[in-house]
């Protein structure tokens, strides 16, 4: 009796160069989102690199209008916000966060594209959401959102004009419904 040769597979398994190649950039994973319930949520939305600086008067006019118009729509209530150079921080409450962020994203994208004279996406990725379950977490998140610009630039100001801490920018937000805010 003669022993036959064994053929090894040439695909699959761990080997050099295997797997999906990295695309680069910060990506939000496509995992199932946590249930919100009646807790507030800290949401961060990043813009694509070609989008102009969000902390300009022109961009503020567009984003402020979108935030004001969408503050109490799509099953979401916007409680606090801060606009940075290339991203937004939002503290929101509500049941249907996905629908609300989609609606807000459409408003912001249409306005920014019209301002820049272009078409296409402006959000870099999915939004990042962190559910704030304890009063301490809420307090820390609100402080982080409202003082984010001061923290990153080192400039000490009374209130950031491009955040909900400023009373001069003309955006009045609705009152929160959860007890933690």
Predicted regions and their residues:
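Short Pro-Cys-Gly-centered "Cys-loop" motif that presents a nucleophilic cysteine in a tight turn
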Residues: 1-86, 93-181
């Amino acid at each position: 009796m003669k022993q036959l040769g064994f053929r090894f597979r040439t695909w699959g398994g761990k080997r050099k160069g295997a797997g999906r190649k990295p695309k680069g950039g910060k990506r939000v994973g496509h995992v199932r989102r946590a249930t919100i319930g009646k807790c507030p949520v800290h949401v961060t939305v990043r813009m694509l690199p070609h989008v102009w600086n969000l902390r300009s008067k022109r961009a503020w006019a567009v984003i402020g209008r979108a935030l004001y118009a969408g503050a109490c729509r799509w099953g979401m209530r916007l409680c606090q916000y801060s606009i940075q150079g290339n991203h937004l921080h939002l503290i929101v409450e509500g049941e249907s966060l996905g629908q609300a962020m989609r609606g807000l994203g459409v408003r912001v994208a249409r306005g920014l594209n019209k301002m820049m004279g272009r078409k296409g996406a402006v959000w870099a990725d999915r939004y990042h959401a962190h559910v704030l379950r304890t009063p301490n977490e809420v307090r820390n998140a609100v402080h982080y959102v409202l003082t984010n610009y001061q923290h990153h630039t080192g400039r000490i100001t009374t209130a950031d004009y491009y955040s909900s801490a400023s009373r001069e920018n003309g955006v009045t937000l609705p009152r929160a419904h959860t007890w933690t805010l």
